Amino acid sequence: MSLLAQLDQKIAANGGLIVSCQPVPDSPLDKPEIVAAMALAAEQAGAVAIRIEGVANLQATRAVVSVPIIGIVKRDLEDSPVRITAYIEDVDALAQAGADIIAIDGTDRPRPVPVETLLARIHHHGLLAMTDCSTPEDGLACQKLGAEIIGTTLSGYTTPETPEEPDLTLVKRLSDAGCRVIAEGRYNTPAQAADAMRHGAWAVTVGSAITRLEHICQWYNTAMKKAVL
């Protein structure tokens, strides 16, 4: 059975939660062994897949979880706004570390390596390709190039201002167009994740609301300060 078919079965049985275990950079939690522990806890709680950034974190996580891992490498480039898995060597390193799915930036922006080249390299390793997109045009273009999974990950992050709510409209438009959609980006409550599934998402990735303790504490602190001021 193919990995996509296996995921279809798991999603039907468990609801389609993917947990992104990406601690705040330089956080006390930003250690491979802690990332792996969070991923294992998420798997034991019913996550159908895990999203991991960085080769060392992926290697540590692969050693302890059996669910599929979506691997990415983030870089800050001087000559491109693209941050997610921008280079061939990133794809190769993630494949060697044990990723099942490799996600790349799928937006229409200047980049060091074309999307189609990265997708071909992912498929060369026999892995599934996911593209992190920001618009319907991004997603449909990536689907035509052969990406098996389209993520709404970058919606709201390629524009001057980022909305507070997730982009359910993008989820629906891509789903209606026949894409296998992972809803991602600002899904901070179970209700929002459920809404994404109702709008046609194949699965939903949740990160900050589960694995970024600093963000969660900030949300509580902000709300509580407003209540007493």
Swiss-Prot record:
CC per GO annotation: cytosol
Gene Ontology terms, MF aspect: N-acylglucosamine-6-phosphate 2-epimerase activity
GO process annotations (BP): carbohydrate metabolic process; N-acetylmannosamine catabolic process; N-acetylneuraminate catabolic process
One Pfam family recorded for the sequence: NanE
EC number: 5.1.3.9
Transmembrane intervals: none
Top-rank taxon, per record: Bacteria
Pathways per UniProt: Amino-sugar metabolism; N-acetylneuraminate degradation; D-fructose 6-phosphate from N-acetylneuraminate: step 3/5
Catalysis: reaction(s): an N-acyl-D-glucosamine 6-phosphate = an N-acyl-D-mannosamine 6-phosphate
Family designation: Belongs to the NanE family.
Function: Converts N-acetylmannosamine-6-phosphate (ManNAc-6-P) to N-acetylglucosamine-6-phosphate (GlcNAc-6-P).
Protein name: Putative N-acetylmannosamine-6-phosphate 2-epimerase
